[in-house]
């Protein structure tokens, strides 16, 4: 069966950068691509790579190749604040390209050098300075080549000609006059320069109902995108894509088929990559084990209460039970870092809760001042915290008074001994919000919408009480709930985890990617807490 590679694709994660850009979840695209027999998939969200690990793991679980990509906003220059955001699709060819693309994403969110100006942006020079590990397409009608900047276009084209092995001119199938004209211009340019045509789809919805729901939500939020009338931004099978080009009739079909085949050429250029799934605890010392052992044994004599309740022999015996487990579970760097934080807290008169969670089972943690719970005295189980036969990412929650919690988080986010970031958290539309938004778009009276919300029923699902709309409401308001069901639980915003801080010694900007928000002065990790934990990154929770 003939097929192609979809690389220009937007999910609801694009809505974190562009308001209500899609109401389609990534799982829907992945399932559809698998159903169509596609062998690779990329998400090119507008100006972000948010939760790329979730996409990678799900795409690979579906038996397809994950392709790391982004639709970047590109400006002529960062020397002045001009709002000229041209679109380019950037695709990582391999692991080095993955790191490079993450760095470019991080750079685009710098709010101090004009990179972030209404949108996260890189400069055209950044595009032209990419390595051979990055594949580039000219994207959509919002791309540079559809602008009136002749001098700038010539600059890019001259550069692209010298990199034609990895730069492609993107045509699209949308049956609108401007796209038809643009496709023809790109074909002429391709003939003149030897740059290859490739077909992008600029997919924003899995199907027509989701496309309608996208418009409904845009209306509800007062969002309007120019020049989308007549566009078909829904997912296309190979046959549907071919038929769309036949109807568009912008180019000879042999040229279209070649542009479709080029998507598979690009897919073949991309090397799958594995992630380092080892522990990534912050490392403060080169000789961690030696430092740890000395700290632990020295603390027998320096701890204010250890020898008051236990003999030295009893303490040493317990230490010798725990130390090998810490070594085998690779937790020593984490414990040293946690002690470093506790020492700072004590020096700054910050009170921490006496002990929370399984760490209180460790006598070594007690000796080092990480917990105030004496696990020998209270007969607590160490192996609930650390177990060589059940190794998990180490996590210690700490309780603070609110002012101290803020101070500790700020310390972690500014400490020059480590690299750190806030952690992404995503806001979704819940049932009541979906009813209100869709009701507003459908111009239902506010009182009636409020009455509908008041009539929601509470049921228990998997042990949790949740609100649902009963059959009576659904029968009375079929159009309302048609769209409510499509937009409920869709991502509409991004913020930060209220307690967690990502702490590392490795370069977060390239191994994960960072972005910025107007609500915090600190950079934020592109993966949420689940993606970070799955890849063994360290998160400290400062709880109130």
Label each region the model flagged.
Residues 1-544:
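Alpha-helical scaffold/interaction cores of sigma-54-like transcription cofactors
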């Amino acid at each position: 069966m003939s097929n192609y590679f979809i690389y220009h694709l937007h999910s609801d994660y694009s809505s974190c950068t562009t308001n209500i850009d899609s109401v389609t979840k990534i799982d829907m695209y992945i399932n559809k691509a698998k159903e169509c027999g596609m062998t690779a998939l990329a998400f090119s969200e507008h100006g972000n790579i948010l939760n790329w690990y979730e996409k990678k793991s799900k795409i690979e679980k579906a038996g397809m190749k994950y392709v790391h990509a982004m639709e970047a906003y590109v400006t002529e220059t960062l020397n002045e604040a001009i709002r000229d955001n041209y679109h380019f699709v950037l695709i990582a060819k391999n692991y080095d390209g993955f790191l490079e693309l993450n760095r470019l994403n991080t750079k685009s969110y710098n709010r101090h050098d004009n990179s972030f100006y209404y949108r996260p942006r890189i400069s055209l020079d950044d595009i032209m300075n990419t390595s051979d590990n990055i594949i580039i397409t000219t994207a959509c009608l919002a791309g540079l080549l559809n602008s009136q900047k002749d001098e700038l276009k010539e600059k890019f084209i001259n550069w692209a000609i010298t990199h034609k092995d990895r730069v492609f001119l993107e045509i699209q199938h949308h049956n609108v006059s401007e796209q038809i004209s643009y496709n023809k211009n790109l074909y002429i340019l391709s003939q003149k320069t030897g740059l290859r045509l490739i077909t992008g789809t600029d997919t924003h919805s899995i199907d027509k109902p989701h496309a309608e729901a996208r418009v409904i939500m845009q209306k509800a939020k007062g969002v309007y995108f120019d020049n989308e009338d007549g566009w078909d931004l829904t997912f296309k099978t190979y046959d549907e894509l071919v038929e769309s080009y036949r109807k568009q009739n912008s180019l000879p079909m042999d040229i279209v088929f070649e542009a479709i085949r080029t998507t598979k050429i690009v897919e073949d250029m991309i090397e799958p990559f594995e992630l380092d799934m080892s522990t990534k605890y912050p490392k403060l010392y080169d000789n961690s084990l030696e430092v740890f052992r000395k700290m632990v044994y020295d603390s027998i004599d320096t701890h204010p209460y250890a020898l008051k309740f236990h003999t030295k022999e009893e303490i040493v015996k317990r230490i010798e039970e725990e130390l090998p487990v810490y070594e085998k579970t690779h937790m020593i760097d984490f414990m040293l870092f946690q002690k470093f934080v506790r020492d700072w807290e004590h020096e700054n008169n910050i009170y921490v809760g006496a002990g929370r969670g399984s760490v209180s089972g460790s006598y070594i943690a007690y000796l080092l001042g990480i917990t105030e719970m004496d696990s020998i005295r209270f007969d607590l189980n160490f192996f609930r915290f650390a177990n060589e036969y059940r190794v998990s990412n180490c996590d210690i929650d700490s309780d603070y008074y609110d002012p101290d919690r803020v101070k500790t988080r700020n310390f972690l986010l500014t400490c020059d001994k480590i690299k750190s970031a806030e952690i992404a958290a995503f806001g979704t539309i819940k049932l009541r919000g979906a009813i209100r938004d869709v009701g507003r778009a459908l111009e239902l009276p506010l009182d009636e919408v409020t009455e509908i919300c008041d009539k929601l029923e509470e049921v228990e699902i998997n042990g949790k009480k949740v609100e649902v709309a009963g059959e009576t409401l659904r029968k009375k308001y079929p159009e309302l709930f048609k769209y409510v069901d499509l937009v409920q639980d869709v991502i509409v915003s991004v913020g930060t985890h209220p307690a967690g801080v990502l702490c590392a010694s490795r370069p977060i900007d390239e191994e994960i990617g960072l972005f910025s928000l107007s609500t915090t002065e600190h950079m934020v990790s592109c993966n949420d807490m689940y993606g970070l934990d799955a890849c063994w990154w360290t998160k400290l929770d400062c709880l109130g």
